[in-house]
Curated annotation (Swiss-Prot):
It is found in: Cytoplasm. This is Crossover junction endodeoxyribonuclease RuvC. The gene is ruvC. It catalyses: Endonucleolytic cleavage at a junction such as a reciprocal single-stranded crossover between two homologous DNA duplexes (Holliday junction). Its EC number is 3.1.21.10. One of its GO terms (biological process) is DNA repair. The RuvA-RuvB-RuvC complex processes Holliday junction (HJ) DNA during genetic recombination and DNA repair. Endonuclease that resolves HJ intermediates. Cleaves cruciform DNA by making single-stranded nicks across the HJ at symmetrical positions within the homologous arms, yielding a 5'-phosphate and a 3'-hydroxyl group; requires a central core of homology in the junction. The consensus cleavage sequence is 5'-(A/T)TT(C/G)-3'. Cleavage occurs on the 3'-side of the TT dinucleotide at the point of strand exchange. It is an enzyme of class 3 (hydrolase). The keyword Cytoplasm applies. One of its GO terms (molecular function) is crossover junction DNA endonuclease activity. The keyword Translocase does not apply.
Amino acid sequence: MAQLKRILGIDPGSRKTGFGIIESGRFHPNYVSSGVIRVEKLTGAQRLKTIFESVCQIIDQYQPHVMAIEKVFVYKNPSSAIKLGQARGVILCAAAIKEIPIMEYTPTQIKSTIVGQGHATKDQVQFMVQNLLKLTESPQEDAADALAGALCHDRYLTLGIDPEKISKGTKF
């Protein structure tokens, strides 16, 4: 039997960051854990510090082999884009410090892989994540998005597609 690989999915946010952990390597992925890092009541640097420390703690607790994180897309509001970029930066820094490889996927890649269409709704993503992982209830939105990222990475691995090429934007 193939060795189990633990995948940490991250849905970055400046106020709420979703995380989800699955194990890959069997016939289908297995759910390990998920949740949301909430920092909306904090300000500026305290938000970033809390996100960083929380991601480090999650990595220490679950020992993932890889992180699958959603790529940033262009926002109409530059301030929101900067805040999201800062949150992503501390998340990527946590993974780098813990020596966890990072794979990046666009929201469209994740939705296409999990739901079958790149413009799927949050409800559709939650529904598919719940069914694919055989969960008794639907995960929170941000946690579902993070689990979807982990499932996307798992699917690419299962299909034998080199995740490095995916992260570099190679078209298939």
